[in-house]
From Swiss-Prot:
GO terms for cellular component: cytoplasm; dynactin complex; dynein complex; membrane; microtubule; vesicle. Modulates cytoplasmic dynein binding to an organelle, and plays a role in prometaphase chromosome alignment and spindle organization during mitosis. May play a role in synapse formation during brain development. This is Dynactin subunit 2. Transmembrane segments: none annotated. Residues 100-135, 353-377 form a coiled coil. Residues 1-40 are annotated as: Disordered. Belongs to the dynactin subunit 2 family.
Length: 380
């Protein structure tokens, strides 16, 4: 019933219950069809794997100095500290490597390659030429590894970019030891082929053997060339051997007989000669032919050998021509790399200046913000 104090008031219903219940609505038929929203490129959908995340942070440790906040400061906050005893972690697919990670990965790969080359050098089944090529490859890898050890990442990137880990400290100690030793190594070009390097090493070894056999004194070689009228050492040796063969005792008698016969013929020709102009011209032509025959006599004997030698050296000349082209191409690439390094250095300098200016501007703005926050907190 209604409360007695509400009696005799307009708008009050009497003889009716105080609680009213609305009837239940009939259940509407609902479908299980779910309309998928169209994909939006502005919304990033990240797919995180729990197992991959567990493996990624399985060796992480926390210390008292960690900071996961996003506060603005000169140095970024420290989060998880990945510590490992000489083990390097490779980045995932699609992730960008840091310079330190690249340096560590290259060191590991070079050590593995050196071990493989050393194992191949010890193998007895490999021929000597292949072992020499492996020696040249090992030399190139050792030089590249030394150059990699000389990189000063802390001076180039700054102390904030290079973490203070055991690997980086060991790398810095190796750089200091190499600096104190005073040994300078040439930086190999990135586009150098290992096969061409092996061929260059083989050619250098053959050149050393040739100098050891013939001699590397230019004075003696110039005198030999002047005496034999040729710049080819093999041809000069063949001429000397031919002349020495003519001076043998069994051939001196034959030469003497031929000279005696020739002298008799010359005497008979001189007796039959007359003072006419036709005879004089004929004698002049005969003397010229005789001089030509005398000049070409030693060449006629060695000419077949010279032709055979030239045919044998044809492949070597082609190989030398190809080698000269390769050297010219390497020099061109080296010049291109040098130019790109200069441009990159200038670009790095400009980026550093811009970064320093931006950092100074940000520092000033942060200081102003902190002053304003301090003033507001003081005013409250």
């Amino acid at each position: 019933m209604a409360d007695p104090k509400f009696q005799n008031l307009p708008g009050i219903a009497y003889d009716q219950p105080d609680v009213y219940e609305t009837p239940d609505d009939p259940e509407t038929d609902t479908s299980d069809y779910y309309e998928e929203e169209p994909e939006n490129e502005a919304i990033e959908r990240m797919h995180i794997s729990a197992s991959a995340a567990h493996k990624r942070f399985s060796g992480a440790t926390l210390e008292g100095s960690v900071d996961f906040t996003d506060r603005i400061g000169r140095r970024p906050g420290r989060g998880y500290d990945m510590r490992g005893a000489g083990e390097y972690e490779l980045v995932g697919q699609g992730e960008k490597e840091t310079p330190v990670q690249k340096c560590q990965r290259l060191q590991i790969e070079m050590n593995e390659l050196l071990n493989e080359v050393a194992a191949l050098q010890v193998d007895r089944k490999i021929a000597d030429e292949e072992k020499q090529s492996y020696d040249a490859v090992a030399t190139v890898i050792s030089t590249a590894k030394k150059v990699l050890d000389t990189l000063k990442l802390e001076q180039v990137l700054g102390k904030e970019q290079v973490p203070n880990s055991k690997q980086v400290k060991a790398l810095i100690s190796q750089v200091e030891e190499f600096k104190q030793s005073g040994v300078l190594t040439a930086i190999p070009t990135p586009g150098t082929d290992l096969a061409s390097t092996a061929r260059v090493a083989s050619l250098e070894q053959r050149l050393y053997q040739l100098e050891k056999t013939v001699g590397a004194q230019p004075e003696k070689l110039s005198r030999l060339n002047a005496a034999t009228n040729t710049t080819n050492v093999l041809e000069a040796v063949r001429q000397l051997s031919t002349k020495a063969a003519l001076l043998q005792p069994d051939k001196l008698d034959t030469i003497e007989q031929r000279l005696t016969t020739l002298a008799g013929k010359m005497d008979s020709i001189a007796e039959k000669s007359s003072g006419s102009s036709q005879d004089a011209k004929r004698d002049q032509k005969i003397s010229e032919l005789y001089d030509i025959a005398k000049r070409t006599e030693p060449v006629v004997e060695i000419l077949p050998h010279v032709i055979e030698r030239m045919q044998a050296l044809e492949s070597l000349h082609k190989y030398a021509n190809n080698f000269a082209k390769i050297i010219a191409e390497i020099e061109h690439k080296q010049g291109t790399i040098t130019t790109s390094l200069v441009n990159n250095k200038e670009l790095l300098h400009s980026v550093q200046e811009t970064f320093a200016q931006n950092l100074e501007t940000i520092t000033n703005k942060v200081a102003k913000v902190e002053q304003r926050v301090t003033a507001i907190s003081t005013a409250k």
